[in-house]
């Protein structure tokens, strides 16, 4: 039986870690990327592994975007991991840049599976987000508990006030579309659906060369604090985190384990604040002491009592593995950044 996995958005932060773990477990991987430049870079980075092939999908929101790939390779594919989705806040064209690409990209890949691989694809995993679960307006309410059953309450209209609200909602609409698709087409498809809903992502880039001056949104928080002058004020930011390596493993478990079928896997390992990150940086990296702010050491625990709570105990029970600690995740992220800057 085929052990081939299709991974959309193969050059993404999460997807690269997924590819690495799949190849280590001897899966055959077909990845989609947006350009021949990304294709060449990825093949080089994975040392032209014979189990990795790539296909070009320039725009996932374009009608029938995945038809060519599924028509060509669909008979080989047993599992599909759809990780491709826009992730940026710096836009004012919310429908064009966030809502429509996320929604249409998800619908497109599911329709292509239905057309060309309905008999061969057994499991589909969609990379969603905690933002599909969390309602922004309720994040600061300590009486609110978000779980695997929660949904972001934003509407198509109400979310279009800024990039953050629109991004949060885009993940909700894309995930909803996936669940609705499986329900409406249950007589025409073989696959079972699982979604993986991660929180803010920390952790190292898979390849050191991908550490640039500006990193993906979550890791840029750590990069930013590393480069914050010692006397500068630090924003009182708090949120929930997960390590990218754990998110990648959750994607594998999402199609490997029977008990994940039909589930939303909320992968997060609790709250953190900027003070927690500063404490780790100052404790673990002597070369940063006196160059970055101290803040108020040891007061990070105070964020635990603030704002809403995310209870993912059901997900933890299903997955059955321990998530990496904030300390490990921040340390590994910072160490890679400092190594690239010859400061380690």
Curated annotation (Swiss-Prot):
Pfam families: Epimerase
Keyword Oxidoreductase applies: yes
Molecular function in Gene Ontology: aldehyde dehydrogenase (NADP+) activity; oxidoreductase activity, acting on the CH-OH group of donors, NAD or NADP as acceptor
Residues reported in the UniProt entry to bind NADP(+): 38, 167
CDD domains named in the record: AR_SDR_e
This enzyme's EC code(s): 1.1.1.-
Regions annotated as coiled coil: none
Gene Ontology terms describing biological process: response to furfural
Record's keyword terms, sorted: Oxidoreductase
SUPFAM superfamilies linked: NAD(P)-binding Rossmann-fold domains (SSF51735)
EC class: oxidoreductase
Family of the protein in this entry: Belongs to the NAD(P)-dependent epimerase/dehydratase family. Dihydroflavonol-4-reductase subfamily.
Protein name per the record: Putative uncharacterized oxidoreductase YDR541C
